[in-house]
From Swiss-Prot:
Biased composition (Basic residues): 10-44
One GO CC term, this protein: cytosolic large ribosomal subunit
Keyword terms: Ribonucleoprotein, Ribosomal protein
Origin superkingdom: Bacteria
Any GO BP annotation: translation
Protein's name in the database: Large ribosomal subunit protein bL35
Region Disordered: start-end pairs: 1-50
Gene Ontology MF terms: structural constituent of ribosome
Similarity annotation: Belongs to the bacterial ribosomal protein bL35 family.
UniProt xrefs under PANTHER family: 54S RIBOSOMAL PROTEIN BL35M, LARGE RIBOSOMAL SUBUNIT PROTEIN BL35M
Amino acid sequence: MPKLKTNRGAAKRFKRTASGKFKHAQSHHNHILTKKSSKRKRNLRPLAVVSAADGPRLDRMLPYA
């Protein structure tokens, strides 16, 4: 059986946690930040967990994560 290919776009965006879930950075926190409140930017800082419905899809895209 051939090696499975990793989806490189997904590999750059998602990391697997120790419990097997995936985490990712939140959107809207890259540019055009001056008009956004400090509270909004602060709340966008922590990594978010991928929903359970999308987990199996990421398992296929990142077979070695």
